[in-house]
């Protein structure tokens, strides 16, 4: 792990820097170093935020999976933009990501869905995510029904369950420093295909 926060301010490659910070978090954070706060906005402009798990990232963007019929799924499909904030308290680091959102390919979604535990794949069918639930029993009944339905063979991916990729136009790295004189580096580009510009920010 890098001990000097000054080291990161020299970086010119945001995805490489993110990979290094995520690797540090995997060694330091006790639970879910890939947990991230995902912010969306509803049709009235009212923000929503919730924790999700980052499942993949590369130079094209940051990937997570969800039910497209959920509140966050519907808000993303409508606005086609989102933001993320990673906070690794043990490292006193934060990364903020903003950009347009695209659906992952069916092949990507199928591959990730197939890698999930069987119970999680059943749950994707049983849960009408974000909609009112009359009782815990109703959910458990749905789980039992789909468990019986898919007792033999593979469990197909629900048509409404897939992934999104945030294609960043802004990535900011923050490191805590004494007396709130933090280090901040912001990478921006006009489009997801553009070249990165880098600025150091006042804390």
From Swiss-Prot:
Residue sites binding substrate per the record: 55, 112, 116, 120, 180-182
Regions that span the bilayer: none
The keyword Membrane belongs to this UniProt entry's keyword annotation: no
Cofactor(s) this protein requires: FMN
Annotated positions binding FMN: 50-55, 65-66, 71-72, 94, 129-130, 174, 184
Note on how the cofactor is bound: Binds 1 FMN per subunit.
The protein's annotated pathway: Cofactor metabolism; pyridoxal 5'-phosphate salvage; pyridoxal 5'-phosphate from pyridoxamine 5'-phosphate: step 1/1; Cofactor metabolism; pyridoxal 5'-phosphate salvage; pyridoxal 5'-phosphate from pyridoxine 5'-phosphate: step 1/1
Sample GO molecular function, one term: FMN binding
GO biological process, one term: pyridoxine biosynthetic process
NCBIfam families assigned: pdxH (TIGR00558), PRK05679.1 (NF004231)
Family: Belongs to the pyridoxamine 5'-phosphate oxidase family.
Subunit structure: Homodimer.
This protein's name: Pyridoxine/pyridoxamine 5'-phosphate oxidase
Originating organism: Brucella canis (strain ATCC 23365 / NCTC 10854 / RM-666)
Protein's gene: pdxH
């Amino acid at each position: 792990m890098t001990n000097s926060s000054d080291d990161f301010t020299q970086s010119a490659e945001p995805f490489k820097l993110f990979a290094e910070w995520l690797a540090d978090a995997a060694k330091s954070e006790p639970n879910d170093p890939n947990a991230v706060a995902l912010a969306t906005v509803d049709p009235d402009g009212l923000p929503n935020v919730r924790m999700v798990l980052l499942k993949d990232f590369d130079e094209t963007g940051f990937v997570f999976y969800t039910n497209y019929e959920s509140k966050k799924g519907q808000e993303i499909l409508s606005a086609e933009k989102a933001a993320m904030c990673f906070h690794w308290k043990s490292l006193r680091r934060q990364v903020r990501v903003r950009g347009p959102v695209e659906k992952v390919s069916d092949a990507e979604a199928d591959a990730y869905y197939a890698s999930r535990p069987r119970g999680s794949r059943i749950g994707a069918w049983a849960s009408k995510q974000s909609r009112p639930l009359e009782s815990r029993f109703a959910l458990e009944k749905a789980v039992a029904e789909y468990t019986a339905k898919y007792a033999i063979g593979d469990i197909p991916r629900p048509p409404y369950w897939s992934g999104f990729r945030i294609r960043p136009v802004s990535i900011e790295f923050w490191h805590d420093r004494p007396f709130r004189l933090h280090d901040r580096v912001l990478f921006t580009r006009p489009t997801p295909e553009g070249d990165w510009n880098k600025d150091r920010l006042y804390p």
